[in-house]
Every structure is written in structure tokens, then in C-alpha cells.
Amino acid sequence: MSLTKENKSNIITQFGGAVQNTGKAEVQVALFSGRITDLTGHLQKHPKDKHSRRGLLMLVGKRKKVLNYLKNVDIDRYRKVIADLDLRK
């Protein structure tokens, strides 16, 4: 259900350039998106799991905040992340 260590390091190197760049906004958005995808699959199997649904909504809110920050700081990086992750905005 959660991201494996290999998946997480692949996402970090793809969006951050190096494994140490975990604080970049692009990396954070990509990691949130991976976790959101996993939770969405879990909730399709278990529709009555209200606690996981709350966690999903919290992750979506966190991702939205980081995306808003990125849009205000650097619109080009924001557009690139949106295009790479196929997010609606």
C-alpha cells in the first residue's frame, strides 16, 4: 500500500536530481502523488475505510499547498510538474 524504498528513491532522483534533494517542492508533490495513487487503489477495494479516506484527503490538501507555493515562486517549475505528473490544473 505504501511506496517502497526503491520507488521513493526513483521518484526523488527523477524530480530532484539527486537522492538528497528530498526537500524540493517538485519531489514533495511527486511523493504525495504516489501516496495518493496508492491510497486511491486501497479505497477502491475497501470503500468503508473512513480513516484511510481522511488520510487521503489530508494528503491531497498538503499537495495542494505545495503546488500553490510552487506556482507563486516559479510558474515554469509548476507547469513542468503538472505536465509530468498529469495533474489537473
UniProtKB/Swiss-Prot annotation:
Domain of life: Bacteria
SUPFAM superfamilies found in the cross-reference section: S15/NS1 RNA-binding domain
GO biological process, one term: translation
PROSITE patterns: RIBOSOMAL_S15
Signal peptide region: none
UniProt keyword annotations, A-Z: Ribonucleoprotein, Ribosomal protein, RNA-binding, rRNA-binding
InterPro entries the UniProt entry points to: Ribosomal_uS15, Ribosomal_uS15_bac-type, uS15_NS1_RNA-bd_sf
MF-aspect GO terms: rRNA binding; structural constituent of ribosome
Keyword tRNA processing: no
Pfam families documented for this protein: Ribosomal_S15
Cellular component, GO, one term: cytosolic small ribosomal subunit
Keyword rRNA-binding part of the UniProt annotation: yes
Binding partners and assembly: Part of the 30S ribosomal subunit. Forms a bridge to the 50S subunit in the 70S ribosome, contacting the 23S rRNA.
PANTHER family found in the cross-reference section: RIBOSOMAL PROTEIN S15, BACTERIAL AND ORGANELLAR, SMALL RIBOSOMAL SUBUNIT PROTEIN US15M
Main function: One of the primary rRNA binding proteins, it binds directly to 16S rRNA where it helps nucleate assembly of the platform of the 30S subunit by binding and bridging several RNA helices of the 16S rRNA. Forms an intersubunit bridge (bridge B4) with the 23S rRNA of the 50S subunit in the ribosome.
Family: Belongs to the universal ribosomal protein uS15 family.
Protein name in the entry: Small ribosomal subunit protein uS15
Protein's organism: Chlorobium limicola (strain DSM 245 / NBRC 103803 / 6330)
Underlying gene: rpsO
